[in-house]
């Protein structure tokens, strides 16, 4: 059953020594009142680990979108994690289905 607003994410990544770009996309229909947290990572100079450059939490209540930023989240939610796009998609999908 589809409820809530449609959320679509598409990302594309092409590195110097790859011929085919890596693309990943996901579509979610969040349930009313469900929290969605999105962290964006950027790798510079092929660093061994990446840190989040932004965090956004969104919640839909009665069709109205409310947002908070990472400064409103607790310290436990700020731990940097390195995930591939596929791992991120799987983790978000898993949390949305809880």
UniProtKB/Swiss-Prot annotation:
The keyword RNA-binding does not apply. Pathogenicity determinant. May act as a suppressor of RNA-mediated gene silencing, also known as post-transcriptional gene silencing (PTGS), a mechanism of plant viral defense that limits the accumulation of viral RNAs. It comes from the Viruses. Residues 69-98 are annotated as: Disordered. This is Protein C4. Pfam families: Gemini_C4 (PF01492). Belongs to the geminiviridae protein AC4/C4 family. Residues 79-90 have a biased composition (Low complexity). InterPro entries: Gemini_C4 (IPR002488). GO terms for biological process: symbiont-mediated suppression of host innate immune response. The keyword Nuclease does not apply. Keywords: Host-virus interaction, Inhibition of host innate immune response by virus, Suppressor of RNA silencing, Viral immunoevasion.
């Amino acid at each position: 059953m589809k409820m809530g607003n449609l959320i679509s994410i598409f990302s594309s990544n092409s590195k110097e020594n790859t011929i085919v770009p890596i693309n990943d996309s996901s579509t979610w229909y969040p349930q009313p009142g469900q929290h969605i947290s999105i962290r964006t990572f950027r790798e510079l100079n092929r660093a061994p680990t990446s840190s989040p450059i932004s965090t956004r939490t969104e919640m839909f209540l009665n069709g109205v979108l409310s947002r908070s930023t990472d400064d409103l989240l607790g310290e436990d939610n700020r731990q940097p994690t390195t995930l591939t796009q596929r791992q991120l998609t799987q983790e978000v999908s898993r949390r949305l289905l809880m």
